[in-house]
A protein has these predicted regions:
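Conserved short beta-strand edge segments in small beta-sheet-based binding/regulatory domains
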Residues: 29-33, 56-68
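Short, flexible coil/linker elements and helix-boundary hinge sites characteristic
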Residues: 6, 10, 24-27, 58-59
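Short glycine-/aliphatic-rich beta-strand segments at the starts of folded cytosolic domains
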Residues: 1-11, 38
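Amphipathic, interaction-prone secondary-structure segments
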Residues: 10, 15-18
């Protein structure tokens, strides 16, 4: 599994809801840490899909690391 953080600057609630629904469909766990950061937990292929998906919002996925 991989853990990562998504930076969600200047997002509306609809943007977060769209990312959340994508995660739910692809078996990715996502947690809102605060107004800017979201923590995600996913298998490597799904994390890659998420990275491609959030790029369309001009968002970034950073600090990806292995989780035991």
């Amino acid at each position: 599994m991989l853990s990562g953080k998504i930076v969600l600057y200047e997002t509306s609630k609809d943007d977060f809801d769209e990312v959340k629904s994508f995660c739910d469909l692809n078996d990715i766990q996502i947690y809102r840490l605060d107004m800017i950061w979201c923590k995600v937990l996913a298998k490597p292929k799904r994390m890659y899909k998420l990275m491609k998906f959030v790029r369309k919002f001009d968002r970034k996925v950073i600090n990806i690391e292995l989780v035991d």
